[in-house]
From Swiss-Prot:
Disulfide bonds join C24-C54, C32-C58, C41-C53, C42-C80, C47-C62. The keyword Secreted applies. Transmembrane segments: none annotated. Contains 5 disulfide bonds. Belongs to the venom protein 11 family. 01 (wap-1) subfamily. One of its GO terms (molecular function) is toxin activity. It comes from Lycosa singoriensis. It comes from the Eukaryota. Residues 21-66 form the WAP domain. This is U14-lycotoxin-Ls1b. The lineage of its organism: Eukaryota, Metazoa, Ecdysozoa, Arthropoda, Chelicerata. Its main location: secreted.
Length: 87
């Protein structure tokens, strides 16, 4: 009996972890002119309201988490500065 209860609780915990996974939303723009690239953030801690710092073609921007994968979070270890990016 105890092993059945444990199995159910384990399954519930695993499904909760999977369902609570959050992602960056799919970017709206698929391309960007180099002169328009701007980083509003370089890591999640630069964002407010538990938003994610997401990499997009026109720079890094804070977005509310999405339940569906499609975007890409900024690597917090990557070299990054906020503001306009000049090439």
């Amino acid at each position: 009996m105890n092993s059945k209860v444990f199995a159910v609780l384990l399954l519930l915990a695993l499904s909760t972890c999977v369902l609570s996974e959050k992602y960056c939303p799919t970017p709206r723009n698929t391309s960007c002119k180099k002169m328009n690239i701007r980083n509003n953030c370089c890591r999640d801690s630069d964002c407010t309201s538990n938003a994610f710092c997401c990499a997009e073609p026109c720079g890094n921007f804070c977005h509310k988490a999405s339940d569906k994968p499609g975007g890409r979070r900024v690597d917090p270890n990557a070299s990054c500065k906020t503001g306009y990016v000049y090439w």
